[in-house]
Amino acid sequence: MNEIKQTRQLLTEIIDFIKATPWKADYQNRFERFYDAAGKPCVLAVAGQVKAGKSSFLNALLGLDLAAVGTTETTATINVFRYGRVKNPDRPVVVYWNDGRAPEPQTKAFIDSLQGYTEEVLEKAEGIDHLEYIVEDEKLEEITLVDTPGFASVVDKHEERMADYFSPRREKLRSKQIEKSGDITEKADAVIFLSGPVAKANAQRFFSERIPHISPFNAVGVMAKIDMIRPTVAMGTGKMEELECVRKEASELSAFLANTFKHDLHSVLPVSASLYHCVNKLWHSGKAAQMQEMIRKIPQDKFDKHFDQNSEHWYAQDGPYNSFYEKCGLDLSIRQSIAGDMPWMVFCIIAVALYSKPLDEAKSFLVDFSGMERIKSVLNDRFFKRSRSIRCSRVLHEAQQVLVYIKNIELPRKLTEVQSRETFLKIIADSHGRYDNNLLDAFAAFVKVNLSDAGELDRYSESIDSLLAKMEGLLKAMEGIEKTNAGMQLLDKVKNLLHGEKEFAELEILLDGNNEKLKMLTADYCNKRQRIWNARKQQTNSEELKKLLAIVCDCYGKLLKNR
């Protein structure tokens, strides 16, 4: 199915219809904009709470080191990531100014300078409309990523009321940021929503007020910074056991958030983008083996006891902890070199894995722990592979709303005008003989030419109904493709739960929509297979297999309707 082609064909039909109606002046341009929008890249907004780790997440997702990351909240405005080739690698970002100045390529140092809330930083940020990153990544060929500042910066402004009271400029900038953030997210075709391990209560309000079109169809949740979770474990628990507890708690928390926002988000996955970034950087630089060698100088019976999550102990310049580490051959300069610029909790997780596992196993464990490969796979399936479908679906829904408005508001209004005109024409007819008949006839002719008649309005109504029916059919076709695509993804995951290659081949043909092979299936066969798969759905304990078989039964149901 070519979503863009079919969407544009339908919009062309709508435009041709509008051209021949009294609403040409008001609506033709709008539908032409819908036509143009159908062919543009899908807009994917990254939204969420302030300090939820959006910049770290984007860096990890795109394999970049561009978006500013730090412990200080970044003041910068909207960040837009588009596909292309950077002309000057030393200036990887283009600044778009509020005052209309020509866009200006800038260095990474400029981006890093937008952290904090000094008067100098605020003055610089006030002049920026947005920052644009050109990224040579094929994922972005049909998707534009937009990183927003974070909704909690104003919604929760009471948390920093005193700081804002003494800095009106900061409050003004915050207000501008939240407004732009909301506007962009509201206009986005799809959303990645980032939250900490505990989503703030105003997240639900943000969904309803700023993203009314959000649904599991076009939104995925990310529970970020799982490296910050402190495990609830008994005394004496080993360090690797603590990490497994963190992973378990992260999974439970993300499942809780997924259930909380089940009507808004397709899923909520736990990630640590900082961990993923640091692991890749450490192994790429070849320093992982050296770090492992240094960490393992700590005797095994002492590691669990002395290596804890208190950074002050690791960086102690004197006292018992410093003495202990020096006896292990780890003086302060070595300890500082090992930790580098890694966030402390991320360093702890990496150190424990390197101490406990062989090098390759440690990397596999850490990458899996970070969750980034899983979220990349989900985003690829939910957004990057579906960008055309998401974009066209959004355009069609907006066009549908306009057509419904014309039918329910504009048509009755025009009908009222026609009825008033009929009354007026009757008055003119009754006035013959009392006034100049030629003048009355001319007046009546003018009224008839410039207003539609009731029959015309009935035809307009029928045409709109026909267009809405076609639109609904196209949207359902897209939804059907979405469902079968989801089924194909599930089929690969649960292949081992099927009874051999024959069952797999049956479902692959069914979900692939191979019309020639499906035409050969009789109604009796479809009915029998639907009952068998429905029974299997009731029996299985696998949630993924249940989801797949629900789609399978639905597909057989549709085939039966056509038999």
Language-model features, listed with the residues they occupy:
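Short acidic, glycine/serine/threonine-rich helix-capping segments at coil-helix boundaries
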Residues: I509-K519, K537-K546
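Charge-dense, extended regions
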Residues: Q538-N562
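Extended helical scaffolds that flank P-loop GTPase cores
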Residues: N2-A45, D264, N280-N514
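Short glycine/proline-rich, acidic loop/turn segments that cap or connect secondary-structure elements
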Residues: P343-V352, T522-W533
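Short, glycine/acidic-rich hinge or "gate" loops at secondary-structure transitions
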Residues: V271, I390-H397, N541-E544
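Intrinsically disordered, low-complexity coil segments
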Residues: R85-R91, D164-K187, G236-E241, V404-N438, ...
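Globular "head" domains of long coiled-coil molecular machines
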Residues: K5-T12, D16, F34-D318, F369-D381, ...
